[in-house]
Amino acid sequence: MIDYKELISAAIESLKKAHKNQPKDLTYGSAVLTKKGNIYSACNYWSYTASLTLHAEQAALAHAAAHGETEIIAIACVGTEDNKKEQFCHPCGMCKQLIYESSIDSKIDIEVIMANLKGEHISKKISELVSHPWPA
């Protein structure tokens, strides 16, 4: 079993750099671990239109791809809203779909690490989180 402490720490550090939204000030961070052992992290980037907001998980996947790495083993997510409730951060449906598509392309069932700011986490394979994927 892989120790995801470094991956979660990278996600938490990215969260601290997130482009905050108003008025709620919600921030998210994410980090991916590639098959080559590299970690790429990113944060959310909020848009005033909301529909143009870039999610942390999307940005982390794009960050890895920008470095030529698309074989993702694991992705960690953290968020401030979830931590107010002392819960683990779960990716939204749109991010689950994108992670699932990455999984299809790489043929790796990506481990999704849902963490809080304390570093505590739960994890599930993306195949467990996406009950009705598209394309099926």
Label each PLM-derived region with a short phrase.
Residues 55, 59, 94-97:
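Short amphipathic alpha-helical face segments that pack within enzyme cores
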Residues 38-39, 121:
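Hydrophobic "anchor" residues
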Residues 44-46, 50-56:
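Compact, glycine-rich, soluble single-domain proteins
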Residues 56-77:
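Short, solvent-exposed cationic patches
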Residues 2-21, 70-136:
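C-terminal binding/interaction regions
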Residues 24-26, 45:
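Active-site segments that bind and position negatively charged phosphate/pyrophosphate groups
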Residues 42-43, 60:
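N-terminal cap/recognition module
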Residues 27-35:
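Short beta-strand scaffold segments in enzyme catalytic cores
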